[in-house]
């Protein structure tokens, strides 16, 4: 599966961010876009259906918050299932894979400079 990962910051400070509209307009199966920078972190929007590869981030924690759909995070020995209005933080150095068995919209918070595909 092809991943569409946009790391450019789409919105400036004091600009309205309509994440719902962006998600509704998305036609890709695995897409994410950096929405804005907040201090030393990035807020990213993802629209996912399918699965990502196993990877880790050596220097950055990663936070996922499900807006709609169902999101699975595979860790060593267990899988965490997230439903709307639920979040989960994967600490740096932890190997993980994300999956979405249906179209799912997720907000992510990551350190600026993160490599979304892993180190």
Language model segments and positions:
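A cytosolic small-molecule/anion-sensing beta-strand core signal
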Residues: 39, 67-68, 83-84, 102, ...
